Each structure stands twice: as C-alpha cells, then as structure tokens.
Amino acid sequence: MKYDNLLDRFIKYVKVNTRSDPDSETTPSTESQEAFALTILKPEMEAIGLQDVHYNPVNGYLIGTLPANNPTLTRKIGFIAHMDTADFNAENVNPQIIDNYQGGDITLGSSNYKLDPKAFPNLNNYIGQTLITTDGTTLLGADDKSGIAEIMTAIEFLTSQPQIEHCDIKVAFGPDEEIGVGADKFEVADFEVDFAYTMDGGPLGELQYETFSAAALEVTFLGRNVHPGTAKDQMINALELAIDFHEKLPAKERPEYTDGYQGFYHLTGLTGTVEEARASYIIRDFEEASFEARKVKVENIAQSMNAQLGTKRVLVELNDQYYNMKKVIEKDMTAIELAKEVMEELAIKPVIEPIRGGTDGSKISFMGIPTPNIFAGGENMHGRFEFVSLQTMERAVDVIIGLVCKA
C-alpha cells in the first residue's frame, strides 16, 4: 500500500516537459514548469491532504504543509525537490520499465542506444530490481521528478495512516535548479522549518552536506579584423586570443581529469569571429581558499595577456553562483545525524561524500535553513542513459517517513 502510486506518479511526472531555459529572464524560466506546478502538483498535493497549498508566482515555488499530529514531536522538517530538468531533450519522454533486471544490455526503445554494463558498471548494482529507463531519445527526468514522487508518496502514506505520529512537515517544489537560479528568490519566511532536505541525490544511501562552491566566468576577447592578405602586424584574431587564454589554464584541472575533492575549470561554450570571441566557463572547488585562488588566476591571466597586447582586449566577468554548504551545516549537524540514524535503522548504509555539483540546498542553507541532500535514486542523470531503480525510490520514501516520525 505504501508504494502503490509511486511508479505511476513518477511516470506521469516525467512525461511532462519541464526543461528549464538558461537564456530566459523569467521565473520560472519556462511556462511549462508553472503549468506543471499548478495543473498537476497543486491539485495532487491538496488531494493527498497537504494544507495551505500555495504557489508563489514571484519565485516559482509550490509549498504545502502537513501539521504535526503529535505535539511532543516539536521539530519542523522540510522536503524540497525541483521541477525542472536538465539541458537535454525532454519532449515526449517515453519511459520503459524493465522488471526484474537480470544483467546485460538494455536496449533503449527503438533507438540505436543501449545501457551496457561495460560502459555503465553501476547497472550491476541493480540485479533483480525494476528499472525505469529512457527510450534513447530523451532524458528521463528522475533528476528530480523521482524526488517529487517520493515526497508525494510519503505524504500520501502519512495522511492515509493517521495513527502514525509525525512532526510538522513542509514541502516545497521549486523551479530552475538545473540552471542554477532556482533558489535565488526562495522565501525563508514561507518555509518555517528547523532544517530541510533536498531529495535530489543519486544512488541508495547518498547523504550529502558538502557541495562545490561555484562561479560563472565569461571572457570576451576583442580582436582587430583586417583582410588576411594584408594582415601582417595588423590583425589580432580574437579566436586565437581565446585559445591562448584556454591553454594558460591548467590542462589537468578539467572535469574529465578530476574527482573527489578536486576542483576544475570547465569550458562550456566558445563562439566568435576574428573580430570578437566569447568563452564561457564554470569554476568549481570545495575549499574557500582554492575557490578564490581559481578566480584570481583567471583575472591574472587576463591581466597578463592585456599587458602583452598593450591594451585591454581580454575582458573577464566573474559571478559567484553558490557556496559549499558545509560551512553552514557543520555548525549544527542535527540534520545529518538524524538522517544517518534513520538510514541505519532501515539497514541503509549512509554514503557521505561531497556532491560534485550543487543543489538548491546550497543557497537555502546560507539563507538560514540547513539543507543537506538525500538520495532520490537517479543514475546517469542529464542524458539519454539516465535510469532509476523503483526499489531505491521506495527506500527514499521510507527515509522521508522515518525522518518525520523520529523528529
């Protein structure tokens, strides 16, 4: 009974295209996210017994409350998941369900793609389980619609079993996490909790309270275009300047060469002509000192190039995006200790590792609500090879219920 609607709920959610748009200036960045909140999630939240369900058009958050039914459980706990999906085709998502996976390749629909344990050895962790995959033409959207489905399913179970005692619960579904702005307008006053959890992690047991600190870097290169036949000592090729800048960054400090606590510079876009070019980077690191050092390094490279050129032709724009939430959460580890205790009671081994990325919790933690991250089940996220285990989603439901009953 507890999980009866979990799979159908998840399938219903992922079939709705809620891809965010990094070039949009609205909140949410796409109309589909607001429509998803208002036409699908809000009525369902009300139907399963959440109270004071309301949508804030300013920040795109849909929030509901389940009051405590035991006054001795005095903590207030929040659960957060994001509605948007990543920068990959999300139109006409057509999930396929693999019952009792027995190993080997999984052909993704009628496409030429397959999930191969040689390429994706994480498949070997799911023998005997029910897997939900893509058809090879879209992403799945388990990031983070598995989290939404898990929260909804846990709330539905609690309201259907009033004899199960629980604390005050707040639920929030927000926009635009994948483009890094989802929590920018989050209203703490509308989410009065002692701490919260984002249900936005990956495999079973993930419990995370360390994220990258993140910055966006835009570098503009100003060239001077003249006819190539008479270009000697006159032309300044902006594209060559961009290449020169990139080559001055440490070659091994890129995503494909780093893991664990190692930071990186990641070139995400390069456009231009001889006259003008533009390079987009993201900068990531865990430690505050090394994060700041990376930003200083790019500034110094630009200054050095400009000095050599004799004029300012390399223009740097740096914007911090979010910070490592460890700095906030380690001051009070209650949320982590509670989650560890609940997982261990459920025979789930907590896997406490840094997130090589960020969550909405990164920003919300710095707003005053410690918000670590818990597994939601997704694997190979952000692309056609994404999949999720139904059994892992069920365990996430168990963790949510355990947290609010133990508070």
From Swiss-Prot:
Its main location: cytoplasm. SUPFAM superfamilies: Bacterial exopeptidase dimerisation domain (SSF55031), Zn-dependent exopeptidases (SSF53187). Pfam families: M20_dimer (PF07687), Peptidase_M20 (PF01546). The active site is at D84, E177 (proton acceptor). NCBIfam families: peptidase-T, PRK05469.1, PRK13381.1. Cleaves the N-terminal amino acid of tripeptides. This is Peptidase T. The lineage of its organism: Bacteria, Bacillati, Bacillota, Bacilli, Lactobacillales. The gene is pepT.
